Design a protein with these regions (language model features):
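Positively charged n-region of N-terminal signal peptides that target proteins for export
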Residues: 1-4, 104
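Sec-dependent N-terminal signal peptides
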Residues: 4-12
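C-terminal segment of classical bacterial N-terminal signal peptides
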Residues: 12-18
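Formylglycine-dependent sulfatase
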Residues: 18-177
C-alpha cells in the first residue's frame, strides 16, 4: 500500500510540475518597476509617509518592495545598478553621464557586455516598456544611436527623455525610424 501511495505521489508531482512548467512560460507574472528621483524613503504611504499614495500603496501591498537596495548620491549610477543588478562601477556608470572618462567603470553609460533587466526579460518572453528618464547614455550621444538607447538595451517601446535634466515644456525628441 505504501509503495502504491508513494508511486502515485511521485507520478502526480511529476505531472503537476510538467504542467506548471508549461503554464509558467505562458503566464509570466507582471512586473512593474517604479524608480522616482529626488524622493525620500518615507515620502510614500507604504513606507510610513504622510502623503497619501493609495495606488502605489496598493502595488506595494500586492507586490514586492525593495528595502535593501544600495543607492548612490547620484541618480544615474543608482539607475544603472537597478537596471543591471551590478554595482554601478561594474556596469560602467561610476559617476555621471556627463563624460566618457575612458576608464572601465566610468564610461558614462551601461557597458555593452552587461545585460539590462529589460534584455533578460525580453529574451524570456516578456513585453518590455519604459516611460520616463533614461539617463544612462553618455551626454552627446543623443543625436545618433550608439547602442545605449533604451530600445537598444531591451526595451521594445520607450517614451521619455534620454538625458538627466531638461524641460518638459521644450523636450528634445528622439524618434524611432
Amino acid at each position: 500500500m505504501n509503495r502504491l501511495l508513494i508511486s502515485s505521489l511521485i507520478l502526480s508531482s511529476i505531472g503537476n510540475s510538467a504542467v506548471a512548467g508549461n503554464a509558467s512560460k505562458e503566464n509570466h507574472p507582471n512586473i512593474i518597476l517604479i524608480l522616482c528621483d529626488d524622493m525620500g524613503f518615507s515620502d510614500l504611504g507604504c513606507y510610513g509617509g504622510e502623503v497619501r499614495t493609495p495606488n502605489i500603496d496598493f502595488l506595494a501591498e500586492e507586490g514586492i518592495r525593495f528595502s535593501q537596495f544600495k543607492n548612490t548620491g547620484r541618480s544615474c549610477p543608482s539607475r544603472a545598478a537597478l537596471l543591471t543588478g551590478h554595482y554601478q562601477h561594474e556596469a560602467g556608470m561610476g559617476w555621471m553621464t556627463a563624460v566618457d572618462e575612458h576608464r572601465p567603470g566610468y564610461r558614462g553609460q551601461i557597458a555593452a557586455n552587461i545585460p539590462t533587466i529589460a534584455e533578460v526579460l525580453r529574451d524570456n518572453g516578456y513585453a518590455t516598456y519604459m516611460s520616463g528618464k533614461w539617463h544612462v547614455t553618455v551626454d552627446g550621444a543623443f543625436d545618433e544611436p550608439n547602442g545605449s538607447y533604451p530600445v537598444q538595451r531591451g526595451f521594445q517601446k520607450y517614451y521619455g527623455c534620454l538625458s538627466g535634466g531638461g524641460s518638459y515644456y521644450a523636450p528634445k525628441p528622439v524618434y524611432s525610424g
